[in-house]
Swiss-Prot record:
Taxonomic placement: Eukaryota, Metazoa, Chordata, Craniata, Vertebrata
Entry keyword annotation includes Membrane: yes
Membrane topology, Cytoplasmic segments: 1-217, 294-304, 362-376, 468-529
Motif Selectivity filter mapped to chain: 424-429
Single annotated GO MF: potassium channel regulator activity
Purpose: Potassium channel regulatory subunit that modulate the delayed rectifier voltage-gated potassium channel activity of KCNB1 and KCNB2 by altering their kinetics, expression levels, and shifting the half-inactivation potential to more polarized values. While it does not form functional channels on its own, it can form functional heterotetrameric channels with KCNB1 and KCNB2. Each regulatory subunit has unique regulatory properties that can lead to extensive inhibition, significant changes in kinetics, and/or substantial shifts in the voltage dependencies of the inactivation process.
Domain remarks: The transmembrane segment S4 functions as a voltage-sensor and is characterized by a series of positively charged amino acids at every third position. Channel opening and closing is effected by a conformation change that affects the position and orientation of the voltage-sensor paddle formed by S3 and S4 within the membrane. A transmembrane electric field that is positive inside would push the positively charged S4 segment outwards, thereby opening the pore, while a field that is negative inside would pull the S4 segment inwards and close the pore.
Assigned keywords, A-Z: Cell membrane, Ion channel, Ion transport, Membrane, Potassium, Potassium channel, Potassium transport, Transmembrane, Transmembrane helix, Transport, Voltage-gated channel
Quaternary structure and partners: Heterotetramer with KCNB1. Heterotetramer with KCNB2. Does not form homomultimers.
Membrane topology, Extracellular segments: 240-270, 323-340, 399-411, 432-438
Protein location: Cell membrane
Name this polypeptide is given: Delayed-rectifier potassium channel regulatory subunit KCNS1
């Protein structure tokens, strides 16, 4: 243990550093211990043996210089060894020069445990703090894992490892099912944009009605109508593929071509065509309304659900543009009509993406999208495992079955068999007949079970996490009082970004009041440690 402060002793000008052990918060720190002035610098701003008066969250205590000198690498030890007031201010949140008191806006309960650490040299875990908050406090005060008492160290490490972390490995924020405060801040920031907009209150109500099904009764009705239109569009697309509709439309198309007319006007059944036009009109109304009511146009085009809405109506308008383009060229021959038919078929195939519009009204689909977004590493590992297994077992099967003429003619042809075998699908269209081939197939199936099961468990756990989190958000909206929500909306009327910054500054004014008034629960004079 370094003894940097000795009563009545002068040091030469030096600047020493103490490398602290790995803090409980998980980051390594290199702490500046002291800057002792040279003998000719004059009188110090405070005596080296003067007791340190601190105020941590309203708890006032006096700490002796000798107790702090035992642990010079901690924040209070460095504060005691500070060579100037400017250096000391960098270590605390505020300083009252008249009372010579240092203020820290930290957890007062942890500070009481910190006082016990300065007396005994051991830090005990507080049950009132979660392991992550405890680690952050310990990191702030400059305590390492070695400071933990032996009776609490194993329990602390076990609790820290058992707590779920954020699914995004790039984030340091602990995982939680509860709504994140940042999400609430983002919503308030978006709603604040309506304060300076024209007809902002009306636009805000319409936006919330279209975006939040649980906001009001009209929003629930709008959601039901939107879901019904999506299901009707999908049903019409499925009915259009039935054989009786295909035969009737093919005959009408042949008759139209023979008469020198475009077959596109007669291919669709009149009822299905009218239903398609109605669905397109509704989808177009949804997209345009959301675009006009959105608080931010840039954020609108960055949202995945809005992109799905655009893709759901894009094929219809592209088909119209293709027909107009060929019509302007005056092409009525079979070649131009054939090209138009291929373009229309491709665009009609894109209508299948309309099923993704249900994600706006489905908690499970949104949770699935969030799971895939945060599981790209696991999905990549799964594909890598499958690729390696398919390549190995396909080569073995080709070697064993190439002479039997049962479909294993080339290694690329064996890839299909290896894929359906490793995924335990087993279509049975290609099967091995030799003993060596059957052994290879058995190994392929068993390897597929083991390989697929490993990352699937992690992905399923992430899906469960995001699903519970999404349900918690929806429950918070449903169970909240409607009048309270209206008060929240009214509070952001006329609010700008500058006013939000002003409110943050105002919220910090209470810190100086703590320095002037003493908490009623505290004794008249700080206790000495």
């Amino acid at each position: 243990m370094l003894m940097l402060l000795v009563r009545g002793t002068h040091y030469e000008s030096l600047r020493s550093k103490v490398v602290l052990p790995t803090p409980l918060g998980g980051r390594g720190t290199e702490a500046l211990v002291s800057e002792c002035p040279s003998p000719d610098t004059g009188i110090r701003w405070r005596q080296s043996d003067e007791a340190l008066r601190v105020n941590v969250g309203g708890v006032r205590r006096l700490l002796s210089a000798r107790a702090l000198a035992r642990f010079p690498g901690t924040r209070l030890g460095r504060l005691q060894a500070a060579a100037s007031e400017e250096q000391a201010r960098r270590l605390c949140d505020d300083y009252d020069a008249a009372a010579r008191e240092f203020y820290f806006d930290r957890h007062p309960g942890f500070f009481l445990g910190l006082l016990h650490f300065y007396r005994t040299g051991h830090l005990h875990v507080l049950d009132e703090l979660c392991v992550f908050a405890f680690g952050q406090e310990a990191d702030y005060w400059g305590l390492g894992e070695n400071a933990l008492a032996a009776c609490c160290r194993a329990r602390y490490l076990e609790r820290r490892l058992s707590q779920p972390r954020a699914w995004d490995e790039d984030s340091d924020t602990p995982s939680s099912v509860d709504p994140c405060p940042d999400e609430i801040s983002d919503v308030q920031r978006e709603l604040a944009r309506y304060g300076a907009a024209r007809c902002g209150r009306l636009r805000r109500r319409l936006w919330l009605t279209m975006e939040n099904p649980g906001y009001s009764l009209p929003s629930k009705l709008f959601s039901c109508v939107s879901i019904s239109v999506v299901l009707a569009s999908i049903a019409a697309m499925c009915i259009h593929s039935l054989p009786e509709y295909q035969a009737r439309e093919a005959a009408a198309a042949v008759a139209a071509v023979a008469a020198g007319r475009s077959p596109e006007g007669v291919r669709d059944d009149p009822v299905l065509r009218r239903l398609e036009y109605f669905c397109i009109a509704w989808f177009s109304f949804e997209v345009s309304s959301r675009l006009l009511l959105a608080p931010s146009t840039r954020n609108f085009f960055c949202h995945p659900l809005n992109l799905i809405d655009i893709v759901s109506v894009l094929p219809f308008y592209l088909t119209l543009l293709a027909g107009v383009a060929l019509g302007d060229q005056g092409g009525t021959g079979g070649k131009e009509l054939g090209h138009l038919g291929k373009v229309v078929q491709v665009f009609r195939l894109m209508r299948i993406f309309r099923v993704l519009k249900l994600a706006r009204h489905s908690t499970g689909l949104r949770s699935l999208g969030a799971t895939l977004k945060h599981s790209y590493r696991e999905v990549g590992i799964l594909l890598l495992y499958l690729a390696v297994g398919v390549s190995v077992f396909s080569g073995v099967a080709y070697t064993a079955e190439k002479e039997e003429d049962v479909g294993f003619n080339t290694i690329p042809a064996c890839w299909w068999w290896g894929t359906v075998s490793m995924t335990t699908v087993g279509y049975g269209d290609v099967v091995p007949v030799t003993v060596a081939g059957k052994l290879a197939a058995s190994g392929c199936i068993l390897g597929g079970i083991l390989v697929v099961a490993l990352p699937i468990t992690i992905i399923f756990n992430k899906f469960s996490h995001f699903y519970r989190r999404q349900k918690a958000l929806e429950a918070a909206v449903r169970n909240s009082n409607h009048q309270e929500f209206e008060d929240l909306l009214s509070s952001v009327d006329g609010v700008s970004e500058a006013s939000l910054e002003t409110s943050r500054e105002t919220s910090q004014e209470g810190r100086s009041a703590d320095l002037e008034t003493q908490a009623p629960s505290e004794p008249p004079h700080p206790q000495m440690y």
